[in-house]
Amino acid sequence: MEKKTFYLTTPIYYPSDKLHIGHAYTTVAGDAMARYKRLRGYDVMYLTGTDEHGQKIQRKAQEKGVTPQQYVDDIVAGIQELWRKLDISYDDFIRTTQERHKKIVEKIFARLVEQGDIYLGEYEGWYCTPCESFYTERQLVDGNCPDCGRPVEKVKEESYFFRMSKYVDRLLQYYEENPDFIQPESRKNEMINNFIKPGLEDLAVSRTTFDWGIKVPGDPKHVIYVWIDALANYITALGYGTDNDEKFRKYWPADVHLVGKEIVRFHTIYWPIMLMALGLPLPKKVFGHGWLLMKDGKMSKSKGNVVDPVMIIDRYGLDALRYYLLREVPFGSDGVFTPEGFIERINYDLANDLGNLLHRTVAMIEKYFGGAIPPYRGPKTPFDRDLSETAREVVRQYEEAMERMEFSVALSAVWQLIGRTNKYIDETQPWVLAKEESKREELASVMAHLAESLRYTAVLLQPFLTRTPERIFTQLGISDRSLKEWDSLYDFGLIPEGTNVQKGEPLFPRLDIGVEVEYIKAHMQGGKPAEAAKEEKQAARAEEISIDDFAKVDLRVAEVVQPERMKNADKLLKLQLDLGGEKRQVISGIAEFYKPEELIGKKVICVANLKPAKLRGEWSEGMILAGGSGGGFSLATVDQHVPNGTKIK
């Protein structure tokens, strides 16, 4: 059976400078949608690219002493490298300087002139060079550009005009007959009230004051207005107007144009009218999302608040960034990036909720069943039943949210399942069940439910996180492709009996919030990594000791075999440790940071020759190493293959 198609586009980016995290936001969102649709079995066409013509580009190139083509070639290479680092799974990258695009734009313009939709006249009015936009006097805000707030220039020149007014009634009728065409709804009201109702004037679609652009056929002193040029990319990339237009016939009209709210006007007024004039179907939806802002407003170099996505990826990993962008901000609204919020999302959502759930599940399956996942035989208890029902309900919520492009809602649903699974461990207490042979079958059911819940989680995370789901599948021992597909979510309990788990590295190590916030802020300001802050912290150094003093400390590798809470001591945990044939009990003040069950199987470092001491009525026969500052905290651990009792030198 032939697959359904899904055509999704991002705006094509203007390569006048290095892209920041706000630009990455749109493309990551589009990538998540493209991956989701592929997961659902669609034949997806995901398009992105660059808008490389215009007066601003020409001026920037002149400032640098290079040709406009050299200027854009250099920046476009950086954009493509950024998309590679972000794992953007685009199917085509269109450049408006490519011949495949320019030839068709010339044909489109010539056709519109021939049929009388474009005519030659004279333009006198206001022009914003950064936005490449024309405005009437009444559209200006305090004399400045209504979109970016910068000063505008008064221009008077011969120009070709597009008869926008001819199509206004048809456009409003399309809005009425297709209520979901502009999303969110507030954007539609803005277009009608601010641009159409006041009277849509004919649009100047050529310039004569610069020459970096596609020339008007038969009148080369005119350059085609950059937005007419740029908007056509959505069909030129598909081969429209060529002998090889198979993709155009297959994918057009677009299912979704993803754009920032500042360019909704071009995509919901100029573009539909242009398509009407060409006799082509209109896109099904234009989604104008909000901006990713900083606390002090939009990102700008002058404010020193630009966040480089490459820096974030290199230090924290790609999935941490992708998760934050799509979880933190409701898509369609403005959102604020804060270093504190970013690090907290990593620590709480990714390291604690997800990472620890996987770690303790794998550790318990190894400990209680030799690493083999027990068979799923249906729910044994109300807790089992509730977990499996939650998983199915989360899939329903997730699907509804994704179809509405509510990415944060979809991720919230996944974390609802993760939270329910963590609670399930507390409810079933597998470490207690393991003490009674009569509870063996119930314990097996708990392990099977935990593994299956994590499999559901990994499947649902695939559109958002490009590396982590496969790491989860690997630790669960799942290699069968069918268990990673959407259709596998229709049945709970598909992991084959005896599938062997493989303990791996933590998905997301905990971070020191104070240090990492300083690091990000230093880079936002164009400074070096937060070495200065680290040096200040290290200034008050501890008293120096000799190597002989240090040699007196006996540090050994120990495995946590039985952790439990201390009665009447909120901050203390009682840990039974295996030091390689020797058992020790250690009381540790880590209860604020770790749940007992997530410590099972961890290889920690124990001070083995510390004099025993009594704490809250219990003997502590050593100390385990841990550390942190600024709100972050982590145990010192070693690789799993290091034998218990190994001396640390």
From Swiss-Prot:
Binds 1 zinc ion per subunit. Its cofactor is Zn(2+). Is required not only for elongation of protein synthesis but also for the initiation of all mRNA translation through initiator tRNA(fMet) aminoacylation. Its main location: cytoplasm. It holds the Pfam family tRNA-synt_1g. It comes from the Bacteria. Its EC number is 6.1.1.10. It is found in: Cytoplasm. HAMAP family: Met_tRNA_synth_type2. Zn(2+) binds at C128, C131, C145, C148. A motif ('HIGH' region) lies at residues 13-23. It comes from Geobacillus stearothermophilus (Bacillus stearothermophilus). This is Methionine--tRNA ligase. A motif ('KMSKS' region) lies at residues 298-302. Residues 555-647 form the tRNA-binding domain. GO terms for molecular function: ATP binding; metal ion binding; methionine-tRNA ligase activity; tRNA binding. Transmembrane segments: none annotated. One of its GO terms (cellular component) is cytoplasm. SUPFAM superfamilies: Anticodon-binding domain of a subclass of class I aminoacyl-tRNA synthetases, Nucleic acid-binding proteins, Nucleotidylyl transferase. Belongs to the class-I aminoacyl-tRNA synthetase family. MetG type 2A subfamily. Keywords: Aminoacyl-tRNA synthetase, ATP-binding, Cytoplasm, Ligase, Metal-binding, Nucleotide-binding, Protein biosynthesis, RNA-binding, tRNA-binding, Zinc. The keyword Signal does not apply. ATP binds at K301. Gene3D superfamilies: 2.170.220.10, HUPs (3.40.50.620), Isoleucyl-tRNA Synthetase, Domain 1 (1.10.730.10), Nucleic acid-binding proteins (2.40.50.140). Homodimer.
